[in-house]
């Protein structure tokens, strides 16, 4: 972008309202009027007041609040519940409140009707505190006595043009009409920016939404975004990016169960990953979630546990039966529960509540137990979209998410699917099942997938006891898995067989040693006989040698005697 294009681009005024500046790419158009329209009770006045308060406190921009309906005292009392002390801001001359009473019967509809007196009053208020922002609440009261649309349009144009000349960023609230965005049906045409607030009730659940209908000089989305009025003001659900560009961690964190860590190469899950545990009722899904939550708290990190089925007290009581006490982590506020029925909020509002929890509590682990209950808050497509946005958001915040899901179907290996259909989004997927054989019901666990890490492909028997959790290698026979009593009996039988084989081996070993001893004795006797024969041979050879020497000596002696007696 060139310097010239940058200088011509629209300058925006940040509102400070949580999430709103994100969906408008920076806020409201600076130095221009913005119309906030909607039905009664949707939050128009609150939006305008927060715009002024945030500007004065966070951005150092004083503001003027002009009310045509409520008095200054009423406004101060109404917003005090949100923790805003307008009285102090007024005393510090950061905000000026001016209540202008307009009586419709006193307005004379003539060709000379204008707002010159209003301009003088507004100009004085703006100059008095050096205001950069202004709120007019509500515009209908000002023109309530006029029926000539030409006059209304002309005066609206004059009012908006005058506000632009003053260089203030203006927010004007307006009541929604029957067929138009406003009662007059004119305000939206002369406004540079139009924001529509709405309140909808679907299946007895009310949801407030906000929509940017018009924004001159700026790109904007036409989508409706849910918002909530909280204890500290308005919060708009931020946009979840559809671009998969979040960073990932190489750090591994414990599952809270040493034997389960071993199934993941002794290191556990990846931090910031998504984990899914599926299984039928009673297989131990909540138990795995609770041990992971405990491991998180033991590291000094925070865990947010979203329970959609049981109360926190019931969850903690049930976990005490397997020796898991979560009360220390609740007392230290490392663990927080948010237990609400799915029917309390629709999916958009629930997603917004989770955003709010994450923003304020800053957990490193979020548990949703169970996720399958949320299907009652919407159809399958809406529920899948909800979890897709939730997982993407938590991953972008480097927060690990642990989901449990109740699956149905027959017992066996045919439950490798989720009703919501989010298994493809999961980095790690564990399956819990129960086997009912010979009057017993035993739990088993195995890992269906775990992206980016070596993991066991073996089945483990999942045992819950007063001492906690134990994962034992299940006996796998010909086409079946033996657990519980069958596994124990099979182990005992194998031990008995091994003992008998060992005894037979010892007997064979002793027989071999005896045979070896006898053979060795025979070998020793033969070796002695051979040695005796060797000695006899040596004696014979010695005698033969001596005989030959004697014969030679005799010959030499005879020869010598013949030589001596020979005649000369």
Swiss-Prot record:
Keyword Cell cycle: no
One Pfam family matching this protein: ATPase
Record's keyword annotation contains Zinc: no
Modified residues (Phosphoserine): 423-424
Gene Ontology molecular function terms on file: ATP binding; ATP hydrolysis activity; kinase activity
Key words, A-Z: Hydrolase, Kinase, Phosphoprotein, Repeat, Transferase
Top-level taxon: Bacteria
Catalytic reactions of this protein: L-seryl-[protein] + ATP = O-phospho-L-seryl-[protein] + ADP + H(+); L-threonyl-[protein] + ATP = O-phospho-L-threonyl-[protein] + ADP + H(+); ATP + H2O = ADP + phosphate + H(+)
Record note on quaternary structure: Multimerizes, probably forming homohexamers, no interaction with KaiC1 or KaiC3 is seen.
Function: Autophosphorylates independently of KaiA.
Family: Belongs to the KaiC family.
The protein, known as: Circadian clock protein KaiC2
Phylogenetic lineage: Bacteria, Bacillati, Cyanobacteriota, Cyanophyceae, Synechococcales
Gene, per the UniProt record: kaiC2
